[in-house]
Design a protein with these regions (language model features):
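Short, Lys/Arg-rich flexible segments
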Residues: 81
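Acidic, glycine-rich flexible loop segments
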Residues: 6-31, 46, 128-181
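N-terminal, post-signal-peptide soluble/periplasmic segments
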Residues: 1-26, 98-125, 193
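Extracellular/periplasmic, surface-exposed regions of secreted and cell-surface proteins
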Residues: 91-100, 106-110, 142-235, 244-515
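Residues embedded in well-ordered regular secondary structure
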Residues: 1-75, 269
């Protein structure tokens, strides 16, 4: 600072006494990374128990595990820091009949993380050692200073034998710049516990319907995924004291103290940061697999849906699908896949909430043709081409974007700004009952192969993806009176207008061998 023409921040007396350690409470040199505050290691233990058994019709397995982990901090509330987790997981496999089987899976997790309301590690990396003395002995108080004694004696945070200091009683020190600190927090600010509870459950049955039609089967499943978390905390505030040092009879004593803050202790645990999430899912599907000579057929008829409830959000996230896939190949040489999916979205207006997404793929295994079959170094060579139109609402960010919106708190206007101003009722968006799904149209052609006893593999794919119908409010395609700048108002709706294209080539090359 002297080089800049400013007065020195620290006097030579401050520097000397800090280095000499003559009075660590007046000239602090606070340490963080010592054995007074930190353990050399932290403990962790794990316990796991497994149970299994069953008979002809049912088999079960259960796993119970628990772990608890301590912390490096070893003083104040920090020595009580811990993390623990209890997990119970089990499943039951059922053989109901020769043609029917089922299962039940369940998992529950209980997780807790307890810690002090002190940001010790942050302070250790940022707080300068000479900024503040966190604890000051009561013995330095002037016994004739009634005002200072009264302030200190009224404090509820007189710390007995704090870590790293000689035995005795201490009050919480401070300065005007640092009225609280991480060490005082550790003894007087309280603690918090973050709690998480999770539960997953699924059950299903599977039926072999070959007695009705060869290769036919059916399975259905229901699942629940639930989680909740919250924080409980004891949030105390506390008084700290800045001191004015003086010299009396050759000894350094405290001439006066200044109180910062107040002692507040309710004794009541606070609950905050509560969050909850629940997902319910169901699926049911028929599968058909059969071969007729060189003709191989595979088909799936699938219906599924899920609904997700999230705390703090009004709308549930819902998804429902009905899909059909038919796959055919001739002698594993020529392939054709046809698929269709019926999708539903509550984000769209009535009449436009359902759509069909078709997909088709063709494949040709060139390596099985006569003109390549005898090429010894060629193990596999396939040519594929596919086209898909996917109707999706992932890019529709909110519900009711097809609705018109008015506000009663629009632009201020009037004859007098002081007495007669009122707000207009303005349109903020027009409605559009024709709003539809965003379509993702994808065409791809690929060549895949394996060479030299399958040691070398490669894949080359060309793709051309067009996303059509992205939502926008293009006011420039509407008459100018549909949008005004004063008052600020618009009747322009969201429409399916945006379009983008992504095209390119992917190439991958792999090699594997035994050494």
């Amino acid at each position: 600072l002297a080089n800049d023409g400013l007065s020195a921040k620290y006097s030579w007396e401050d520097i000397y006494n800090t280095a000499a350690g003559t009075n660590p409470y007046r000239y602090p040199n606070q340490k963080f990374y010592t054995s007074d505050y930190l353990r050399k290691n932290k403990s962790r233990y794990d316990v796991t128990a497994e149970f299994e058994g069953g008979g002809k019709f049912a088999q079960f397995y259960t796993n119970v595990s628990y772990y608890r982990e301590g912390d490096f901090l070893n003083f104040g509330e920090g020595k009580n820091n811990y993390t623990d987790r209890l997990n119970v997981r089990g499943n039951i496999d059922l053989q109901l009949a020769d043609w029917a089987s089922g299962w039940v899976n369940a998992n529950a997790t209980y997780y807790n993380q307890h810690g002090s309301n002190s940001e010790f590690w942050k302070a250790a990396s940022t707080l300068r050692p000479n900024r503040v003395a966190p604890f000051i002995p009561l013995s330095y108080l002037d016994p004739m200073d009634a005002n200072s004694l009264a302030l200190i004696n009224n404090s509820r945070n007189i710390i007995t034998n704090p870590a790293g200091l000689p035995a005795g009683k201490y009050f919480l020190g401070a300065t005007q710049e640092d009225q609280t600190n991480a060490f005082a927090d550790m003894y007087a600010a309280g603690y918090n516990t973050w709690t998480s509870r999770q539960m997953q459950f699924d059950t299903g049955v599977k039926f072999d319907l070959s007695s009705l039609l060869k290769g036919l089967s059916f399975k259905t499943m229901f699942a629940v995924d639930y989680s909740t978390s919250y924080t409980t905390s004891l949030n105390d505030s506390y008084a700290t004291f800045g001191v004015n040092w003086t010299q009396f009879d050759g000894k350094q004593i405290i001439g006066s103290v200044t109180q910062y803050g107040e002692d507040k202790h309710t004794g009541t645990l606070n609950s905050s940061n509560s969050a909850e999430r629940q997902t319910l899912a169901w699926t049911g599907q028929f599968d058909y697999v059969n071969s007729f000579g060189n003709h191989n057929v595979n088909a799936t008829l699938l219906a599924n849906g899920y609904q997700q409830t999230i705390s703090g959000e009004y709308h549930k996230v819902s998804n429902a699908n009905l899909g059909l896939l038919v796959s055919y190949n001739y002698a594993h040489k020529y392939y054709a896949d046809l698929a269709a999916n019926v999708v539903h979205s509550a984000k769209l207006p009535e009449g436009n909430r359902n759509a069909i997404s078709p997909s088709a793929t063709l494949g040709w295994r060139l390596s099985e043709e006569n003109f390549l079959k005898d090429v010894n170094w060629l193990n596999d060579l396939r040519l594929t081409a596919g086209y898909t139109v996917l109707n999706q609402d992932l890019d529709i960010s909110e519900y009711f974007m097809y609705k018109n919106i008015f506000t009663a708190t629009g632009t201020w206007w009037g004859w007098s700004d002081a007495n007669n101003s009122i707000q207009t009722s303005d349109s903020q968006r027009g409605g559009n009952d024709k709003l539809g799904f965003i379509k993702r149209k994808e065409f791809n052609v690929g060549l895949n192969g394996a060479l030299f006893s399958n040691r070398l593999s490669f894949a080359v794919n060309y793709y051309n993806t067009v996303t059509d119908g992205l939502l926008a409010q293009p006011d420039y395609i509407y008459p100018s009176y549909m949008h005004t700048y004063w008052p600020v108002s618009t009747f322009v709706p969201y429409i399916n207008y945006g379009k983008n294209r992504r095209t390119g080539v992917d190439f991958s090359l792999g090699y594997k061998d035994k050494v």
